[in-house]
Amino acid sequence: MRILLSNDDGVHAPGIQTLAKALREFADVQVVAPDRNRSGASNSLTLESSLRTFTFENGDIAVQMGTPTDCVYLGVNALMRPRPDIVVSGINAGPNLGDDVIYSGTVAAAMEGRHLGFPALAVSLDGHKHYDTAAAVTCSILRALCKEPLRTGRILNINVPDLPLDQIKGIRVTRCGTRHPADQVIPQQDPRGNTLYWIGPPGGKCDAGPGTDFAAVDEGYVSITPLHVDLTAHSAQYVVSDWLNSVGVGTQW
């Protein structure tokens, strides 16, 4: 199995390094990751400037100022030859649950892999300690995929409780929960008296009941949520169409 491995925490982050070491025991792994933390970069691409890369002695490649999506795009289309069999993103430091998937560079890297035609996993740890647990879970899933491919055409968003492996209760297939809107902005002043702003933490849990990714992780289970990129609200198409007809928009300007 050939694996393109990326993340949004940066090429030196403990999550990606722990996972790369574990994966290399049974797979051919090419790390292509940002040279710095790009958390929250979502699916952004660098279009207004060129991208430079740096290759370390162990073969890992850092993309200077690159986004997670840049890294996967370059990895698939230029840097990994032969091309990978699968794209894996992670292990993220902290969860990507519910609405987090909209902003997550970890999930975005997996989405880019899927967009380019490859199976893809996004892996996150609900904390900053037991990366070895998340690596073991990921390796188990990838070994299973080697034996029997999962042809859903979907991204698997995997969130792992920050627990020792022997305390993980199992795996649940879940849906994305939701968070309350984030509303905190943290102002500071620079030495010249100018105001600076920091984006605050994400909103608290809103829909976090049974069946959600939040609930699974809180209860000690690995959460696997299949994701797709069709953002069309199909059930709303008729509502919008009826509304346009009723108000006359499009029949006269």
UniProtKB/Swiss-Prot annotation:
A divalent metal cation binds at residues 8-9, 39, 92. It catalyses: a ribonucleoside 5'-phosphate + H2O = a ribonucleoside + phosphate; a ribonucleoside 3'-phosphate + H2O = a ribonucleoside + phosphate; [phosphate](n) + H2O = [phosphate](n-1) + phosphate + H(+). Keywords: Cytoplasm, Hydrolase, Metal-binding, Nucleotide-binding. It is found in: Cytoplasm. Transmembrane segments: none annotated. It comes from the Bacteria. One of its GO terms (cellular component) is cytoplasm. It is an enzyme of class 3 (hydrolase). Belongs to the SurE nucleotidase family. This is 5'/3'-nucleotidase SurE. It comes from Escherichia coli O7:K1 (strain IAI39 / ExPEC). The gene is surE.
